[in-house]
Amino acid sequence: MPASIFVFADLHLGHPDSPGLRWALQELEAAANSGATACVCLGDIIDRNATASECVPQVRTVLDRAVELFNEVHFISGNHDTHDELDFPPEVTVHSTQVHTFQIGETTVLSAAAATDPDLRRLQLPPRPSDAPFLGLLHSSVTGEFSHAICLPLSVDQLRACGADAWILGHVHSPLTLADAPFIGWVGMGNGLLFDPDTCHVTRLPN
């Protein structure tokens, strides 16, 4: 059975508007109960202005729980995450800032983590490698009109040109959808998305 993938982003622990540790733990439980077997944090799990002594242990608590609930857990940093030395469980795969692909079950995932704050790099994205399910994950402001800060800028056309079945994005805090076919949109703060490799559809986890 293909692994369904749960994605969350922009938790921003330590920010006044963060949904908080309790929400994160409940969302992980809800995703696991929905049938997701893999979990991806798509950046900004901690706020750049967070008190590290308080919030870095909270990050570890979230990721420890994810490891307990899912067969695999992946971390793709956002621009805010670059300010702190985060403590990762050994079971968590922390991804490179370079463009790369990796496998979650039968799904090929294309990604690159943010390296700096801001991260102004313009990435060169490769084309679809095969007929297998293909998911793009990026912490990006895209063309910037929905963001206060630039992060890994690119266009919707560049995302489409890769041929991915969906692009799930972090960085913008509102759960906005830029395109429906294929899905291109931001998770949003206080939200979670599910990618089903059987259908290649993206759905929002009910709050």
What is each stretch, according to the model?
Residues 62-73, 179-189:
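Short acidic, glycine/proline-enriched helix-loop-strand junctions
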Residues 58-70, 156-163:
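Catalytic-core regions built around general acid/base machinery
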Residues 148-205:
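Conserved beta-sheet core of the metallophosphoesterase superfamily
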Residues 7-9, 39-44, 72-79, 84, ...:
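Active-site neighborhood of phospho(di)ester-bond hydrolases with catalytic His/Asp-centered motifs
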Residues 16-18, 43-63, 77-97, 147-148, ...:
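Metal-dependent catalytic neighborhoods of phosphoester/phosphodiester hydrolases
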Residues 81-157, 198-199, 205-206:
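Conserved catalytic scaffold of divalent metal-dependent phosphoesterases
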Residues 35-36, 108, 163:
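Short loop/turn motifs at secondary-structure junctions
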Residues 1-58, 130:
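N-terminal active-site segment of His-dependent metallophosphoesterases
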